[in-house]
Structures are given as C-alpha cells and as structure tokens.
Amino acid sequence: MGGFAEAEDLSGVVSDALGKRRRIAGVDRLRGGTKKGVYRIRLDGTGPASLIVYRWADEENFWPGAAGEVTDPFAPVSGLVPFLAARRRLDEVGARVPRVLWTDDTRQRHAADVAVVEDITGGTLEALFDTDPARADAALNDLARTLNLMHRHHAPRYGRVDLLERGGVALGDSCEQLVLDRALRDLDEAAGRDTRIAAARGRLDVRLRALRALVVPRTEYGLIHGELGPDHVLVSAEGHPVLIDVEGLMYFDVEWEHVFLRLRFGERYAALSRPGLDPPRLGLYALAMHLSLVAGPLRLLDGDFPDREFMHAIVEHNLREALALLP
C-alpha cells in the first residue's frame, strides 16, 4: 500500500484528457483520501490553472481487503463505475458535484481507473468555518437545501446507486437489520482489539438488540451520501456546496445520514436537521456508527495509513461516545 503516483505517471493522464498543449507545472497529492489518490495538477499555458485527478489504484486504497461485496451498502467501494453512477444520480436531483472532464477505466494506457475533474478552488467547508464564517454559514444553509433534495428523492429499495442502476438487489432484509448485523461484527472486532470495549461487550450487545427491537419496518428510502462531513464538501467560487467522495452514494434510511451529520458537524448540525426523523432508528444508528468508527479505524491502522495520530483520535472519541450511550 501507499505507492503514490508521480508527475511522470500523471502526465499521460493530462495529455489524454487535454491534449499535448498543456504541461504539468506541479503536482500535489491532497490529504485525506483512503480509497483513492486525489491529485491537484497545476498547469502551464492558457485555460484552467489546475485540475484534479482521481486515481483508483490498489496501492492507494488503504483499506484491508480492498473492495467488498457490491450488494453490501457498507462494503468499501472504489472505482470509476460507482463514481459515475453516483454523479449521474446527483445531477438528476440537483446536487452539485465537480464537473467531469475525462475518464478511463480500460487500464490499457493507465494502471488504474482515472478521472479528470474540475478543480473547485474555494476550499472545504470545514476550512471555511475557521477562515470565513459568514461564507461558510451561507454554504451550510445551501447544503441543507441540497440534502433536502437528496433525502426526499425516494426509492422502494435500499442499496448503492450503481447496484440498483444495474437492477441488482442489496444484501439483507432491511436497513435496520443490516445495521444491527454490522454493528455486532464491529463490536466483536473492536472487543478483540481494545480492552475497554471487551469489558463492556455484553452490555453493548444487549443494548444494540434492544434498540433494534424498537424499529418499525419501512418500504421507502432516501438518497444519502453516507459519509458527508464538512471535509467532503467543497465551496465553489459562487459560494455553493459541491459534494465529493460520492462513490458510496446509496438509497438508505436517511436517519443514518443524519447520525453521521450530527457527529461530524457538531453544534452546526442544527442548520442541517429536519423534522420527521424516526427516534428508534436514530438511537440504533448512533450506537452502531460509533462502534463502526472504532472498529474501522483500528482496521485501517493495521496497514500503513500515514495519518495515524488522526485515526487514533477518531477511535478514542467514538469509543467514549459508544460507552456513554449505555444505560
């Protein structure tokens, strides 16, 4: 793992996308990606000063086991096909995503799936909260409208967009059972790695099953990003939110999205909240998500993920939060 692309590797991508008239002036690998490489390419000549290259290469996917079962909404997802399917669906509902300039998944000229997209240079919403709060607040309110469009775009089945687009059927019988089954696996895994979880394992198991028993079935699901934090929202020059890291886009219980939004946006979540969410689902999904954010980062740390201190901090925070949810 961790074999990043060099300027020489990316020059062919730029040449194929833009022609021979543009030359690379510099390359920066952007921080944060765990399933693909994201590179800002600075260019000489006329036209856009920079663009972004997504590179879905095995050596840039830090998750052990790489891609998972496509029918599992929670399995790691990577590649051009789910990216383009997600982008098409977001276009349909009116959510902004970076404009795609060129793609290739043949792996004949390039060793990975690649996409060239426009560079949204206004920074992340997360950064703007510190540097330009007024601009960030306006973008946050616009993001709330975008999420409302997505979450009210319903489907009769849950699952990843690329799977449903092909007529496939997602794993499991219901969102809530899928979440419970995953949470129990995460609990087992985390208990084997951390003594504090191991000590509370029985109580956490009982609590998860009790919360699941309160959930009433439903037959309609909203469109969710799945991992939407302020670091996954860019802000355009016009001040509009632009969603990135969209490969895991799926139809699911919107409560799952809201639990993650509340976790990642903290006190700013109030701008994104909405009435009508199901309290039993929120309770189950909150505990399940905290356990996932203990087990997942611990799994990631088995590899050579570079920002290890950051991952350890995620583990510690979510471990405390999970234990705090015990009665």
Residue spans of the language-model regions?
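An alpha-helical support segment within catalytic cores of ATP-dependent transferases
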Residues: A5-R21, Q108, D132-N141, R145-I224, ...
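Conserved N-terminal boundary motif of the eukaryotic protein kinase catalytic domain
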Residues: R21-D28
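Short Gly/Pro-enriched turn/cap motifs at secondary-structure boundaries
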Residues: D28-L30, I224
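ATP-binding pocket architecture of kinase catalytic cores
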Residues: R31, K35, R42-R166, A170
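Short strand-connecting beta-turns/loops that link adjacent beta-strands
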Residues: G45-G47, Q108, A237-G239, L287-H290
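Active-site Asp-x-Gly
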Residues: F62, E220-I224, G229-L287
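ATP/Mg2+ or Mg2+-diphosphate-binding catalytic cores
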Residues: E189-A199, L293-P327
